[in-house]
């Protein structure tokens, strides 16, 4: 859910996120709302959703993946994003992170994530 403001907002879903001092500093963005400007797509007190699928690509141990995501902003579906090809080390931990910001106003609580789900198959 977004806060009751018309501040510009942005949400990103990261795969193999690199985190330093509590801030995501690297990784692959696998779903992104883009610059969610209220004047283009209303973002005052509306719902949002990011989804992405990540698949193993290539031979075992090649550390190559394929990801594709989409975003829904209020009542507007952003379509399917371009493919992303992460290179996470598959024998270690892979960090998945969700970031949100009110990037022009820096207002706290302008974006709220109410749940986060990861499903895996082998």
Language-model segment annotations:
Residues 1-122:
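Surface-exposed molecular-recognition determinants
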